[in-house]
Amino acid sequence: MKRTTYAGLVDEKYLNQTVTLSGWVQKRRDFGDLIFVDLRDREGIVQLTFNATHAEALAVAENMRNEYVISVTGQVVRREASQINNKIHSGQIEIDVIEAEILATSKTPPFYIEDNVNANEELKLQYRYLDLRRPEMQKNLRIRSKIMSSAMHFMDQNDFINIETPILAKSTPEGARDYLVPSRIFPGSFYALPQSPQLFKQLLMGSGFDRYFQIARAFRDEDLRGDRQPEFTQMDVETSFMSADEIRELVNAWVKAMMSDVVNFDLDTTKIPTLTWQESMDRFGTDKPDLRIAYELKDVSETVKSSEFGVFAKAVEAGGVVKAIAVPGGAENYSRKDIDKMAQYIERFGAKGLAWLKVTDEGISGPIAKFFPNHAALLQVTGAKPGDLLLFGAGRNDIVAATLDYLRRQTAKDLNLIDMTNPWAFAWIVDWPLFEYSEDFDRWIAAHHPFTMPNEEDLHYLDDGEDPHQAHAQSYDLVLNGYELGSGSIRIHRMDIQEKMLKALGFTPEAAHEAFGFLLEGMTFGFPPMGGIALGLDRLAMLLAGQENIREVIAFPKNSRATEPMTQAPTRVDHKQVNDLGLFVSDVE
């Protein structure tokens, strides 16, 4: 039987027509001489009816079970009024089946194929091909596909050239650990899977292509969390002779087109705010703020530095800060026990406690209220009103920022204070520090990557005798709803500046040329001013699909241990293959 349409597309327009459908049995209800079967395919569900009028088809239906693959031919008829289901597209009609065939049988699945299924995450990953049958997963991956199609169309319309860059590349010290691939032909030598196409796309600009685009796979051997995977996909762009402002305007137009194509949302890009990195950190405690949350961090250091509360006074005296958030309605909704739980959680950020006050019609209450008999100034600075809960952070600026950023996001989630009238809150974060200190590496590293151009007025900081860590960069991040969606910058195109940048990062001239000699030499042949950005496809798909984990928008993802339960990768390989690579693998318990 040749399929004529999808099950989920059949509706009243097909009344009295004969159709042939194929798909999976979602549910079967047997009433003897009348059997109902819900047929599911990628477009949705339609109800099939089998009755004694077509005895052969009824006999086939008697053997059908959940997840059997079937094909049917029948007439589209209107459902009885009591059978109408307005929750599905085909809910007004059903198929009176004339002919039926079972194409494949199925074992009983380890979990039911439906949305909101109560199944262990590892089990769903182990049987990912079953999990992907769920309507929600089908929707998620189609959203991902739409994003890719929209991006490629936009780039084609704007004269970008789609160029693929190597997957087997040279290992370069760009930040995260590389995934290494041993060479059989050159024993002891390794390729690296690229963490990004960064160097290749700069070389393409040096080659004169002017506008490059690629949907690129990238790989990083790093610890995982909900919005990260060891392999990921980015929509990668590089341009020549464009300023940072021009690149951001281009990306705004690109994102506007994608939002329209994928979720039918008319994004007003004129309302996308641009914040400096410092402003974002001061107001929100993070470089990826969720602007749907109205309340912000308020610096109360000057107000409390002379208070009798020693924790605050000592923090300011030691060069730290005291900041607060006023959580609307928090006074009534958080008990002391709730606040104690928050205090325990924020210890992971380095916080040594959580000071708080509840604002009432009479004034303030709480364990530190007695230290602020004249609290009017405190309420004025924080903007707190009766019913609000004031949460404080005191100490080192970075610890206070991380603590209050978490508390701001968590309280907004707890109390439904996220403004859903603004469902897509984009923002640009600009003027980043050129360097940042890494606790992991115990040294200064590039805040974005080593090829980011400093601000023009900060170039002198790279000279000998200057402090390079004072420099800021011509870099920009696009943020959406508290997630970093994309990161970009103007690149260094002159060898003298690039060498100074690498020196500031601790590279000797020999080490710089060992790692990046091909790029440095290329710059001696005249590279144009260039800049670009990479948008994370996985993260964008996650947000547009309304998911909280990027695994839900990747067909075959890894789990939090970077393993893939379905194929059980990574696995040991044949001993001969290892020998051919000139490697020795020690036994590891």
Swiss-Prot record:
Enzyme class: ligase
GO terms (BP aspect): aspartyl-tRNA aminoacylation
Annotated compartments: Cytoplasm
Region listing for Aspartate, in residue ranges: 198-201
Entry keywords, A to Z: Aminoacyl-tRNA synthetase, ATP-binding, Cytoplasm, Ligase, Nucleotide-binding, Protein biosynthesis
Domain of life: Bacteria
Main location: cytoplasm
Family the entry assigns: Belongs to the class-II aminoacyl-tRNA synthetase family. Type 1 subfamily.
Quaternary assembly: Homodimer.
Protein name per Swiss-Prot or TrEMBL: Aspartate--tRNA ligase
The gene coding this protein: aspS
